[in-house]
Curated annotation (Swiss-Prot):
<comment type="function">
    <text>The RecF protein is involved in DNA metabolism; it is required for DNA replication and normal SOS inducibility. RecF binds preferentially to single-stranded, linear DNA. It also seems to bind ATP.</text>
</comment>
<dbReference type="InterPro" id="IPR042174">
    <property type="entry name" value="RecF_2"/>
</dbReference>
<dbReference type="GO" id="GO:0006260">
    <property type="term" value="P:DNA replication"/>
</dbReference>
<keyword id="KW-0547">Nucleotide-binding</keyword>
<dbReference type="GO" id="GO:0000731">
    <property type="term" value="P:DNA synthesis involved in DNA repair"/>
</dbReference>
<feature type="binding site">
    <location>
        <begin position="30"/>
        <end position="37"/>
    </location>
    <ligand>
        <name>ATP</name>
    </ligand>
</feature>
<dbReference type="GO" id="GO:0003697">
    <property type="term" value="F:single-stranded DNA binding"/>
</dbReference>
<comment type="similarity">
    <text>Belongs to the RecF family.</text>
</comment>
<keyword id="KW-0963">Cytoplasm</keyword>
<protein>
    <recommendedName>
        <fullName>DNA replication and repair protein RecF</fullName>
    </recommendedName>
</protein>
<dbReference type="GO" id="GO:0005524">
    <property type="term" value="F:ATP binding"/>
</dbReference>
<dbReference type="GO" id="GO:0009432">
    <property type="term" value="P:SOS response"/>
</dbReference>
<keyword id="KW-0234">DNA repair</keyword>
<keyword id="KW-0235">DNA replication</keyword>
<dbReference type="InterPro" id="IPR027417">
    <property type="entry name" value="P-loop_NTPase"/>
</dbReference>
<keyword id="KW-0067">ATP-binding</keyword>
<dbReference type="Pfam" id="PF02463">
    <property type="entry name" value="SMC_N"/>
</dbReference>
Length: 364
């Protein structure tokens, strides 16, 4: 899977841009605030229809413009498809090969990406919401059905919470049954993904850190026992809701379910967020991304595109070297941003292009 051409119009601070990326490494360099990350963000949006920086489409449109256009020509197995995303204050519209796409199923899989940004290290010590967001995005990248289940659960949860706030009992049990059914599917999908990722995570942590520390990743259901979730998830979820029923009525919100669950990152048998150094946390998150890359390749039989934001800020020389070795060994298209080319030894890589970014201009 490769992006052969990219066209951007009125996106963020970027001026009208046309790129013909290299098949392997593409390096965008320049001072902070010039628009480097915006280029990676545009690729991510073309792949997922979401930004990794904002939830509002209006934030993505260049100041003074009424809309933005993103286009990417993606080659896979000898077939090239044109992906076009239109952005305005009403939201996003998608076209594939100039045909409107209304169902996410018809869009899924045309462009697979893995992104690593400096902010993602924050999820180690941050709120559970950050780790859930990471996990949901990763599961969706590999499972076309997950997003529709997630949206269905969110709608049911909203209705159930509304009934709790109003103290209405008439249809409450029906909404609880629906919540359990969709919640079960989310938990099972998350568990399956983590099970598939676990051995890859261990392998790549050794590669990136250069040591034999033991890492693991574990799902932490809220008000549920993990062993029960691996048995009958629906029963475990229903029991958790029954246990929290009195407190739910008092607080007017649903207190158990995948919207409250967490993911625990583990180092040498202990929580990484409490006992891991900053370097260990960086290595762990990067190993997660490497594992995700390998998993997508195995699932789709095609290498995803790797987006690496701000190489200079998050990695020391040893981790940087190990990451570059990982990327060089794969027939993978890579887009990297950095403040200086001195952060990357371009003499050691093949098939690359460099671009200087200055005030929204892409200079070759």
């Amino acid at each position: 899977m490769k992006l052969n051409k990219i066209y951007l119009q009125s996106f963020r601070n970027l001026q009208e841009t046309m790129l013909m990326p290299a098949q392997h490494f593409n390096i965008f360099y320049g001072n902070n605030g010039q628009g480097k990350t915006n280029l990676l963000e545009s690729i991510f949006i073309m792949a997922t229809m979401k930004s990794f920086k904002t939830a509002r489409s209006s934030d993505l449109v260049r100041w003074g413009a009424i809309s933005s256009l993103l286009k990417g020509w993606v080659e896979r197995d000898g077939v090239t498809r044109e992906i076009a995303v239109f952005l305005d204050n009403q939201g996003k519209k998608i076209r594939v090969d100039q045909k409107a796409v209304t169902r996410i199923d018809d869009f899924f899989g045309h462009l697979n990406v893995v992104v690593f940004t400096p902010e993602e290290v924050n999820m180690v010590k941050g709120l559970p919401e950050l780790r859930r967001k990471y996990l949901d995005r990763a599961v969706f990248s590999s499972d076309i059905t997950y997003l529709s289940v997630y949206h269905a659960y969110s709608k049911i949860l909203k209705n159930r919470n509304m009934l709790l706030k109003r103290g209405e009992k008439a249809s409450f049990d029906i909404w609880t049954e629906k919540l359990v059914e969709q919640g079960k599917n989310i938990i099972l999908s998350r568990l399956a993904y983590l099970d598939a990722l676990r051995d890859l995570l261990k392998r790549f942590y050794r590669e990136i850190s250069g040591n034999e520390e033991a890492v693991d990743i574990s799902y932490r259901p809220y008000h549920m026992d993990l062993a029960d979730c691996r048995g009958d998830v629906a029963d475990a979820f229903a029991e958790a809701l029954a246990k929290t029923a009195t407190e739910e009525e008092r607080r007017g919100t649903t207190l158990a379910g995948p919207h409250r669950d967490d993911v625990e990152f583990i180092l040498n048998g202990r929580p990484l967020k409490q006992f891991g150094s900053q370097g260990q946390q960086k290595s762990y998150v990067l190993a997660l991304k490497m594992a995700e890359t390998e998993y997508l390749q195995k699932k789709f039989h095609s290498q995803p595109i790797f987006l690496l934001d701000d190489l200079s800020s998050e990695l020391d020389q040893e981790r940087k070297k190990n990451l570059m070795e990982f990327l060089k060994k794969r027939d993978m298209q890579v887009f990297i941003t950095t403040t200086s080319l001195q952060n990357i030894n371009v003499d050691e890589i093949e098939n690359y292009r460099t671009y200087r970014i200055e005030e929204g201009k892409v200079l070759h």
